[in-house]
């Protein structure tokens, strides 16, 4: 679900000091992202999120494709996941899988939605209304490139939900 496909695997046997044998598996991967991804820039975030998925601390679904496709962190992908689940609960017609695919196709829009959310709610400083308006204009401009009406509706509903949000605990750090 990270937007990659395994194209090769090389196992290596490692003999431990106690005589037991462990295995190291080296996987060759191919990116399936809809947009070019700079893996080197996203490597740390990807590795942290992969470990969290492996340990059951982060959901394993198609929103994780946005880590490489849109350069999001696992936490930012969780933000979009939460809005998608909320929309489904209040009567959204699109499945989570379809919403995930929409954002995988339009990764820049996913990134802009996260920026919009951060601009509106980040406690690190008040973002001007003009900056928020500019982000909304960028989103509207990107929507002109969305060919599918359903995809357009999904993105617009996310903008509506972010704008309807009054407060959030998203920025609370868990201990």
Predicted features and spans:
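Non-catalytic regulatory/linker segments of enzymes
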Residues: 1-175
């Amino acid at each position: 679900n990270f937007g990659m496909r395994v194209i090769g695997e090389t196992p290596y046997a490692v003999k431990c000091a106690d005589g037991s044998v462990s295995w190291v598996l080296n996987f060759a991967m191919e990116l399936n992202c809809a947009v070019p991804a700079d893996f080197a820039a996203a490597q740390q975030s990807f590795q942290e999120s992969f470990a969290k998925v492996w340990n059951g601390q982060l959901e394993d679904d198609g929103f994780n494709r946005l880590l490489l496709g849109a350069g999001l962190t696992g936490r930012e992908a969780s933000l979009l996941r939460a809005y998608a689940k909320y929309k489904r609960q209040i009567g959204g017609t699109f499945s989570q899988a379809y919403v995930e695919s929409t954002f995988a196709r339009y990764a820049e829009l996913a990134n802009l939605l996260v920026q919009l959310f951060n601009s509106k709610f980040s406690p690190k400083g008040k973002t001007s209304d003009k900056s928020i308006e500019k982000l909304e204009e960028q989103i509207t401009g990107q929507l002109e490139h969305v060919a599918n009406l359903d995809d357009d509706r999904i993105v617009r509903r996310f903008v509506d939900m972010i704008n309807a949000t009054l407060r959030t605990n998203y920025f609370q750090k868990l201990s």
